[in-house]
């Protein structure tokens, strides 16, 4: 038989799953966990210890922009990719600034779920964030470099497909699948990291 589990606060599922991708736990520090969706960017500040996530501070969500994925020309796509990239960088830097102003001491890892297939920082040419592949072959490394230039701090950036991030929140259930009904229908499977 099947077990169907409905969760409270399903909008936090990807954020909770992202906590499992944090590789270095820094005592008394928080991590940024961002969920870049097709409609909104959900922003959270999370605290993680050896037993897992223990605090989630949800910030105001931001409207997603520049997530169109059909273009008439390559130039049109490149122009839109640059706008989307700048919007993402601004979102991250503004959120870091908010944390500094509100006494959240951040660790050196930022975890991001994204409504696009991604593997080791390489975004696939599919979906509203797929055009970011035109900005950099490895978008995680690109963000790391841009944030260092802007802020003088070196962050480790980890990007995960949003469905996979959600599923990670349920990784303790064997042979599981996570189904989401957001802007689009989504499916994710927990993976061994």
Language model regions located:
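General N-terminal leader/first-domain-start detector
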Residues: 38, 42-94
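Gly/Thr-rich phosphate-binding beta-strand-loop-beta motif of the actin/hexokinase/Hsp70
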Residues: 19-62, 175-193
């Amino acid at each position: 038989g099947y077990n169907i589990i409905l969760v409270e606060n399903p909008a936090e599922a990807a954020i909770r799953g992202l906590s499992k991708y944090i590789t270095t736990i820094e005592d008394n520090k928080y991590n940024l966990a961002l969920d870049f969706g097709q409609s909104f960017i959900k922003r959270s500040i999370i605290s993680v210890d050896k037993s897992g996530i223990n605090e989630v501070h949800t910030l105001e969500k931001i409207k997603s922009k520049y997530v169109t994925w059909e273009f008439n020309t390559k130039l049109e796509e490149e122009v839109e990719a640059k706008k989307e990239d700048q919007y993402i960088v601004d979102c991250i830097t503004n959120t870091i600034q908010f944390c500094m102003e509100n006494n959240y001491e951040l660790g050196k890892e930022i975890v991001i779920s994204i409504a696009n297939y991604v593997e080791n920082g390489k975004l696939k040419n599919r979906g509203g964030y797929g055009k970011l592949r035109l900005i950099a072959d490895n978008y995680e490394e690109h963000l790391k470099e841009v944030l260092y230039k802007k802020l003088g701090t070196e962050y480790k950036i980890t990007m995960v497909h949003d469905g996979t991030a959600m599923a990670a929140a349920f990784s303790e259930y064997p042979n599981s699948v996570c189904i989401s009904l957001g802007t689009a229908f989504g499916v994710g499977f927990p993976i061994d990291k």
